[in-house]
Amino acid sequence: MVNTTDFYPVPAAMAYESSVGLPLLGWNVPTEHLDLVHPHWRSFQVPNKYWHFGLAFVYFMLMCMSSLGNGIVLWIYATTKSIRTPSNMFIVNLALFDVLMLLEMPMLVVSSLFYQRPVGWELGCDIYAALGSVAGIGSAINNAAIAFDRYRTISCPIDGRLTQGQVLALIAGTWVWTLPFTLMPLLRIWSRFTAEGFLTTCSFDYLTDDEDTKVFVGCIFAWSYAFPLCLICCFYYRLIGAVREHEKMLRDQAKKMNVKSLQSNADTEAQSAEIRIAKVALTIFFLFLCSWTPYAVVAMIGAFGNRAALTPLSTMIPAVTAKIVSCIDPWVYAINHPRFRAEVQKRMKWLHLGEDARSSKSDTSSTATDRTVGNVSASA
């Protein structure tokens, strides 16, 4: 016999009228699908329905912001030739990862409003978690690629810029990087995807108390969070060191020549534009750090710490913060990247980004950084 609850939502009120008190999480999950819900969650009462409605509203707003922001990034890149530089391909790739994160949001909205459990059971849970896995891991390693690109561009302006072929190879590498820890739980090769928190989201299993789960969580933490984070910190540290060394070299050379500065206004504007773009990349990385660190902490506590500290609410908040970054990324880029900002303002004046000619000119000069700043470096 077909279980009709697989296809039709359970009225939300039923969860709150079934007994005098609130029932436990998993009350509306049939026995054949109960494996989706770890026993840890089944010890908590279902959250008040207003928590579900509130989360649905928050996710709907995030979905709208992400759709508009990432849509603008992809549209401007596709229709503006001057924007289509190798470096900006990394930003477009980041937008694509953010779009994958966007695709799972409608599932959570529907689940929160009508089901209060995983939509589509195992299949729906796998789709939701796989989208989140690719988006999260991909964003992390793509931020590392952006940091590498900024380091090469600013520290080696003559021959350090990545070619289009090199950028495409790195972008392909970011997608390949997402596969191991997405496919292994998806195909049940190692670990699996399960419901978590309010049972309206899914992720890899970090609660099963065995050695296999602990090793998996430790490996995915290193692969998707710690290693990209180390790369990013390394590249930005070296970038800052290179900029300081370059400025020191110019000051020393100017002192020897008894002049105030070796840089012309054009040189200064070109270098300033590249540094502004580096600041944008650093801001996006900081947002990634703030968004994904809480979730990384939850997973590590679940595998190695005191699981009693993990309540449904305490795990749903990090799940929300992990989605926020996909909404903010494009707006940070649109507001802070000079040429992109000018192009958006030209086409969408109602956004009132306030881009002036000076900023646009400054970024235009950045396309010649390898010539201007490079000449200064060569003169030393």
Curated annotation (Swiss-Prot):
Record-listed N6-(retinylidene)lysine modification sites: 323
A Pfam family the protein falls into: 7tm_1
Post-translational modification: Phosphorylated on some or all of the serine and threonine residues present in the C-terminal region.
Region entry Disordered, spans: 358-380
Matching CDD domains: 7tmA_photoreceptors_insect
Recorded GO MF terms: G protein-coupled receptor activity; photoreceptor activity
S-S bridge residues: 125-202
Signal peptide annotation: none
Glycosylation sites: 3
Ranges of biased composition (kind: Low complexity): 362-372
Record keyword Glycoprotein present: yes
Chief localization: membrane
Residue spans, topological domain Extracellular: 1-51, 116-128, 192-215, 304-311
Bilayer disposition of the protein: Multi-pass membrane protein
Cytoplasmic topological segments: 77-88, 149-166, 244-279, 337-380
The keyword Ribosomal protein is annotated on this UniProt entry: no
TM ranges: 52-76, 89-115, 129-148, 167-191, 216-243, 280-303, 312-336
Alphabetic keyword roster: Chromophore, Disulfide bond, G-protein coupled receptor, Glycoprotein, Membrane, Phosphoprotein, Photoreceptor protein, Receptor, Retinal protein, Sensory transduction, Transducer, Transmembrane, Transmembrane helix, Vision
Any one of the GO CC terms: membrane
Function description: Visual pigments are the light-absorbing molecules that mediate vision. They consist of an apoprotein, opsin, covalently linked to cis-retinal.
UniProt-recorded name of the protein: Opsin-2
Organism ancestry: Eukaryota, Metazoa, Ecdysozoa, Arthropoda, Hexapoda
